[in-house]
Amino acid sequence: MLSLDKVFDAQTVLKSIIRETNVVKTYGIAPDCDLYLKPENLQITGSFKVRGSAYKISQLSAEEKAKGVIACSAGNHAQGVALAATKNGIKSLICLPDSAPISKVEATKGYGAEVCLVEGVYDDAYNKAIELKEKEGYTFVHPFDDEDVIAGQGTIALEVLNDLDNIDAIVVPVGGGGLISGIAYTAKHIRPSVKVYGVQMTGAPSMYNSIHDGKIETLDTVQTVADGIAVKRPGDNTFEIVKKYVDDIALVSEDEVSSAILAPVSYTHLRAHETCADL
């Protein structure tokens, strides 16, 4: 069960695995407010995803580890699972959509995982992973709809709240909802006055549509340059957490994201991935 104690436990477990990324104050991007970036692109594996995947794997039983782990991913969760599994001597198989960037495919292999490329998008890779789990008996590590994974992502909020005493709001990119669920749950329990806002692409508005319709919606198709959040259906757990703790979700267009990518480079020399440039 998700709890604040679980998030703090994740922070303890992850201390020897991840980097604590310091917030970076920006100048010029948003002159009317104090804007800080949390550069998880500097995290090991290049993404926050390793927080959730590494904590989840740390919580597996000896029997679950012995079966080997299987995961599906648009690319970043894949690398986190591969790294954490290899560090623990666990066999890993990752299902990736064939649209995943070759750099992420090769990095996943480099961290020690076997890769299965699946025609289509993330959701097709998910279906293949479930099929192989049932057939081969692997332990499945979900990329976002898992309480241990969500707790791992929630450690980001612990770091942000520790770094910034007077923070008003946290803005988070949304795909399946694991990141924003962890951040919102943690932030609201520690500092309830902090607003948490999500941002999702107009070409993949699964969580946005679900929240506004009051029930989980599955998209027929997703089409966005932000491949890391191109998810047709949010998670059951993440939907409930977002509904309860997130203040609002906004949609942004492909053009807005393309323009926003340039701002962090210009003002902080940090390159934002399309998935995060939607903020």
Task: Cite the ranges covered by each PLM segment.
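PLP-dependent amino-acid enzyme catalytic core
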Residues: M1-H273, A277
